């Protein structure tokens, strides 16, 4: 993990200073993510999701790299308004911290709480800092890329069926990604729009969820708070729901709720 974080931190610094081609950043993300399965951390069980349970290393390890890169990009792309990325990651890290404490995974809990703790002062100065007084700070790719890999590490650690990390839990695969539903679902929606509009998939646009909130007349601050509330809702809903219904049904409900929410936003935008 530390090697991967160092790689992405260096790439992020260079990109923030002189810009790097997205293809090179993508390669760096793959290399950094590869250290997770190489160190023995990989998704080895889907817990009945789509009818699939145990995964072989030949499938689970490449899947882990794909998922990690997916999370890194989702966190990077959601960094569009002040406090949103740090808020989502900080809140997600807190949830992971309590989940790992519940499962007596103390080292993972410490890492999760450290991640959340580091983001607290950043969130304050990013949202409430004064630009003229040089007290305001911004994340850039340096922060978003490393935070993305940190969240990928926490999510994959919770998803992995490994008694050395935590006891077996039937809903682990759903719970592990519950805190990341907003950025993950958002990047899927945005990439789909770009694909059908024949636009570059990795170039920025104005189709992210925070852009839609702004277009319906909300301020940056209100949009950020509502998106954080939405992410918190999905987190707790998934954690509770997996105790009563199957993983597949929970994911289906998540997708339906996400689509319904965007249909409501689209209608508000048209009315405005």
Regions found by a protein language model. Give the residues of each.
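"…together with the soluble PPM/PP2C metallo-phosphatase catalytic core" -> "…together
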Residues: 1-187
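Membrane-interface starts of transmembrane alpha-helices
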Residues: 21-25, 56, 219-223, 246-250
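Membrane-helix cytosolic exit motif
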Residues: 185-200, 258-272
């Amino acid at each position: 993990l530390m090697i991967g974080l160092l790689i992405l931190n260096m790439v992020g610094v260079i990109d923030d200073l002189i810009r790097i081609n997205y293809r090179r950043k993508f390669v760096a993300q793959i290399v950094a993510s590869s250290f997770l399965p190489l160190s023995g951390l990989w998704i080895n069980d889907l817990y009945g999701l789509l009818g699939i349970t145990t995964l072989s290393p030949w499938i689970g390890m490449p899947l882990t790299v794909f998922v990690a890169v997916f999370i890194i990009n989702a966190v990077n792309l959601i960094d569009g308004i002040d406090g949103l990325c740090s808020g989502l990651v900080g809140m997600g890290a807190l949830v992971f911290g309590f989940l790992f404490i519940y499962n007596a995974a103390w080292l993972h809990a410490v890492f999760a709480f450290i991640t959340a703790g580091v983001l607290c002062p950043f969130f304050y100065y990013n949202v409430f800092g004064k630009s003229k007084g040089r007290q305001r700070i911004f994340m850039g790719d340096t922060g978003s890329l490393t935070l993305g890999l940190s969240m990928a590490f926490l999510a994959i650690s919770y998803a992995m069926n490994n008694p050395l990390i935590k006891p077996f839990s039937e809903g682990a695969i759903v719970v592990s990604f519950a805190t990341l539903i907003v950025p993950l679902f958002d990047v899927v929606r945005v990439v789909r729009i770009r694909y059908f509009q024949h636009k570059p998939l990795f170039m920025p646009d104005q189709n992210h969820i925070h852009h839609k909130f702004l277009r319906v007349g909300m301020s940056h601050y209100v949009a950020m708070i509502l998106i954080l509330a939405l992410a918190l809702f999905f987190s707790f809903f998934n954690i509770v729901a997996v105790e009563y219904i199957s993983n597949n049904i929970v994911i289906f409900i998540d997708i339906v709720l996400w689509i319904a929410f965007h249909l409501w936003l689209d209608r508000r935008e048209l009315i405005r």
